[in-house]
Amino acid sequence: MLSTTQSTLLSEAAHRYAQAISEEALAYLDARGISEVTAARYSLGTIVDPIEGHQGYTGWISIPYFTALDICVGFKFRRLDDGKPKYGAPVGQKSHLYNVTATTYDSPKIVICEGEFDAIIMNETGIPAVGVPGVAAWKPFYPKLFTGFDVIYVIGDNDTREDKETNPGAEFARRVASEVVNSQIVQLPPGMDITDFYLANGKDELTNLVGGVR
């Protein structure tokens, strides 16, 4: 549990980073189907004047995590160049469910995605969605958050490739679905995540994967 001082520091940083979002970051997000308006809605930003623990990510895209009470509890970072690793997070930071507010929506369905940007894309189609940054970030108490939904769609990245013997996205989907009541796995085409599918096929085809918007 973060102290009030820590939460305030993180929330102020999230606001500052969002205000400083760069044209390069906006161009990257736009190419991934996330508009400037949507980026602002989720407080996506650019790391400038970093707080302690964020110094190694200056210039990266900031992805803040908020509670259902709109309190910032952590960050994920996405680099803009082709370097590795593509994503980062402060050392020692606890993992959280991204866009957890979606679990409070009055909806018959919700989608559990593998990643933050995928959750944003799905939410913007009108279907509530949360993001989990990989199977290792799934926690034993998460299933309780989805009680009350008629159906919970689980969509992992389809990491199938000829040069890979494992499929982490499929493992993620199986693990989550095995613990969440009323869940259904939706498998994407090989090599695709939700964002890839959206960019290739559009909003209607994406929402049709989970029964359409209703």
Model-derived regions: residue spans:
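RNase H-like polynucleotidyl transferase catalytic core
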Residues: 130-135, 182-192
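Class I S-adenosyl-L-methionine
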Residues: 30, 123, 174-178
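TOPRIM metal-binding catalytic domain and adjacent DNA-binding surface shared by DnaG-type primases
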Residues: 1-62, 66-69, 101-105, 179, ...
